[in-house]
Amino acid sequence: MTDKQWATLLSVIDGNIVKPMPAGFIIDSPWLPGWSGITTLDYYTSDTKWFDANLKAIETFPDIIFLPGFWAEFGMCTEPSAFGSRCSWGENEFPFAHKVITDIAQVDSLVKPDPSKDGLLPFVVNRLKNYEADIKKAGH
C-alpha cells in the first residue's frame, strides 16, 4: 500500500474518524488470476504474471487499500508447506495443503520452519525481493 494508505489505516486503527471513509479489501489469489485473465497456475508460477495482476488491481482501484498489498503467497499452501505439508495444484483451482498431523496431540512434533529454506517460504521471500524495486516504483 502507499504511504498515504498506510497512514489512513493506522488512523482508522487508532479509532479516528477518517473522511472520506476508506475502503479496503484483501488482495489475494482467489480472485486475482481470473479477474486478470490468466490461469491460477500461471499466477503462481510466473512472477511476471503475478506482478502484472497485482499491479492491475492497484491501478484499477487506486483509492482502495489492499491488504496486504502485493499478495506473494502461494494460496493457502505457503505456511503449511514449511511444516512439510504436501500441496496439490490445479490449473484453475486453488492449491490445497494436505494434513501434516492428524491429532492436536501431535502439534509438539512439528519443527519450527526456517523461512530461508523450508517449503514455499523461500519462493515468497525471493519473489518479494526480486520485485521490491518495481513495487516501490508503483508507489507501494
Residues of each region from the PLM?
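Catalytic cores of TIM-barrel enzymes
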Residues: 1-140
